[in-house]
Each structure stands twice: as structure tokens, then as C-alpha cells.
Amino acid sequence: MIEKVKQAILTILQNKQRNGDVLPYATSIEVAHLLKMNALEVEKIAQGIEGIVKGKTLNHEYYYE
């Protein structure tokens, strides 16, 4: 499941053509929808994937590689 989440994250980020590979909560929702999972489950798995680090801003939490 970790590999599926990682691949979904990378696919969505490539589709968005983002710089810095940011995974805001909205992307977590997109990954969850794609994999038929809960967004919180996606975020918990994403935290455990090497290279994805949890960070915070004033408005949202995010993950990045």
C-alpha cells in the first residue's frame, strides 16, 4: 500500500506540474479518492515514506520531498 500511495502522490504532483513536490491536504484528498482510501490514512502513510517530510504553515499542513 505504501508504494501505491507513493506512486499516486508522484502522479498527481506531476499532473499538477508543481515545483518542490508539495503535498497539501487537497492532494491528500485526491490521492485518497484515487485509491479509495481516507485522506487521513493517506497522510499517515505519506509520513512514513522516506523523502516525504511533514511541515506546517499558518494555513495548512503539507508534505514534501
Where are these regions (language model features)?
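Surface-exposed, interaction-prone regions with an acidic/low-complexity signature
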Residues: M1-L34, L40-E65
